[in-house]
Amino acid sequence: MKMIVGLGNIGRQYAQTRHNVGFMIVDELASKLNVTFQTSKFEAQVATAFQDGEKILLVKPATYMNDSGRAVGPLMSYYNVDPADLLVIHDDLDLPLGKVRLKQKGSAGGHNGIKSIISHVGDQHFKRVKVGIDHPQKMSVVDYVLGKFTPAEVAKFDDAKITALAAVEAWLANDDFTAVMNQYN
C-alpha cells in the first residue's frame, strides 16, 4: 500500500493559494485515477484507488498545514503504511516557481507541515515531491504563501503540476523512486 499526501490548508479562502499546491496536485491525481475524496475519522479527506492490485491512499489533511502530522500519523498507523511508502507533495519557498524536486528523505527544511509529519510519524525517511513557489521579494512570507498565484505565475505552476503528476505516476508504476528522481530532478 502507498499513501500520497498533498499538503494544504482547509477552507475556501485558501483554495488556489501557493501553500495549497499539494492539495491541487492530489486533487488532479484523484481525478486521473477516477476516485473521490471522503471525510475520514482521522481529520483528513481520503480517496482510495487501486493500481495493478496495489491499494493507494490519497490524503488531504483536514488540519491546518502546520499540524498535518496529526492526520498523517494516525492514518499511517491505522493502515500500517511504512514510511518508505509515504510520499508527500508540498510547496517549497526555496525552489524557483515551477521547479519540481523529488527527495527520498531528510529534514523538514523549514517547512512546518513536513516538520509536523516527521514529529507524528517519528521518521523522516519518506518521499517528497517539492514544488517551487519561489521566495517573496517584498512581502511577508505568510502573506505570500497564503496568496493566490498571479496570472503570470499560473502557467509556470501548471507546468510544475504536470511534471509533479508525471513523477508520482512513474513511482506508482515502477516503485523505483531513485530512478524517478534521476528522471525528474
Curated annotation (Swiss-Prot):
Site (Stabilizes the basic form of H active site to accept a proton): D91
GO cellular component: cytoplasm
Uppermost EC category: hydrolase
Alphabetical UniProt keywords: Cytoplasm, Hydrolase, RNA-binding, tRNA-binding
EC number, as in UniProt: 3.1.1.29
Domain of life from the UniProt record: Bacteria
Positions annotated to bind tRNA: Y14, Y64, N66, N112
Catalysed reaction, written as an equation: an N-acyl-L-alpha-aminoacyl-tRNA + H2O = an N-acyl-L-amino acid + a tRNA + H(+)
Gene Ontology biological process: protein quality control for misfolded or incompletely synthesized proteins; rescue of stalled ribosome
Subcellular location(s) of the protein: Cytoplasm
One Gene Ontology molecular-function label: peptidyl-tRNA hydrolase activity
InterPro entries hit by this protein: Pept_tRNA_hydro, Pept_tRNA_hydro_CS, Pept_tRNA_hydro_sf
Catalytic residue list: H19
Pfam family name, one: Pept_tRNA_hydro
Statement: the UniProt record of this protein carries the keyword Hydrolase: yes
Quaternary structure and partners: Monomer.
Primary role: Hydrolyzes ribosome-free peptidyl-tRNAs (with 1 or more amino acids incorporated), which drop off the ribosome during protein synthesis, or as a result of ribosome stalling. Catalyzes the release of premature peptidyl moieties from peptidyl-tRNA molecules trapped in stalled 50S ribosomal subunits, and thus maintains levels of free tRNAs and 50S ribosomes.
PANTHER family referenced in this protein's UniProt entry, alphabetically: PEPTIDYL-TRNA HYDROLASE (PTHR17224:SF1)
Name under which the protein is recorded: Peptidyl-tRNA hydrolase
